[in-house]
């Protein structure tokens, strides 16, 4: 997907109150940008490092700027987690995720049990595949990892996928790594051991795991290639 308008370069000053980032534009002006990321962004907030912003002319928005990309060790990292589902929808429409090809149609934000899963794919014969998408930005050593903070919501989604499998459907947890500099993924057991254990249980009960990395530039971002993974 291409960004609708060219991104604006800036420099990171600070992130605070979870959804706010102060940055300095090229002309020296300091602005506050919306940070559409509920995680900790561990290892990604480097004072003075380049970042890239999108701008909205919508007068109803409280903040015109949104933090889209940061730099980590020279690599671009997509920190707008709200894009992950849009990236997957685009990839599904373009058949760029082979294990999720061949479906007649899909729905988004589908209620299931007491949760809501990101996608429900319907095969031509009617079989259902439920997919939950997780945006990954964390780098631990040379591996992509999830989560970057304790996530009770993530465990709830895994429980819904486990239930879907037991009900005779297909359940898939799809990790979208919004960076292109890493080749392997693992659960971040040192950050959230409960989630790592729940993920292993889910896989042992038939939930499928897919991990795909993105290709990123300051003009576009798209789902590009599968990554290897370990669960231990």
UniProtKB/Swiss-Prot annotation:
CDD domains: SfsA-like_bacterial
GO molecular function: DNA binding
A Pfam family of this chain: SfsA_N
InterPro entries in the cross-refs: SfsA, SfsA_C, SfsA_N
Family: Belongs to the SfsA family.
Descriptive protein name: Sugar fermentation stimulation protein homolog
Source species: Magnetococcus marinus (strain ATCC BAA-1437 / JCM 17883 / MC-1)
């Amino acid at each position: 997907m291409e960004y609708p308008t060219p991104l604006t370069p800036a420099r990171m000053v600070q992130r605070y109150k979870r959804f706010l980032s102060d940055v300095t534009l090229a002309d020296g002006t300091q602005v506050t940008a919306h940070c559409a990321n509920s995680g900790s962004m561990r290892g990604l907030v480097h004072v003075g490092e380049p970042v890239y912003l999108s701008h909205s002319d919508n007068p109803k928005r409280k903040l015109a700027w949104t933090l889209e990309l940061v730099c980590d060790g020279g690599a671009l990292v997509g920190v707008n987690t709200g894009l992950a589902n849009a990236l997957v929808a685009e990839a599904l429409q373009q058949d760029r995720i082979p294990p999720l090809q061949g479906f007649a149609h899909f729905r988004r934000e589908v209620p299931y049990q007491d949760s809501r899963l990101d996608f429900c794919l319907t095969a031509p014969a009617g079989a259902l595949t439920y997919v939950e998408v997780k945006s990954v930005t964390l780098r631990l050593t040379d591996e992509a990892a999830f989560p970057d903070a304790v996530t009770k919501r993530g465990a709830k989604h895994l429980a819904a996928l486990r239930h879907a499998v037991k009900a005779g459907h297909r359940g898939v947890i799809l990790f979208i790594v919004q960076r292109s500099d890493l080749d392997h993924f693992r659960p971040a057991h040192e950050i959230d051991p409960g989630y790592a254990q729940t993920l292993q249980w889910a896989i042992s009960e038939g939930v499928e795991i897919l991990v795909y990395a993105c290709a990123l530039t300051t003009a576009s971002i798209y789902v590009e290639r599968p990554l290897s993974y370990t669960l231990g």
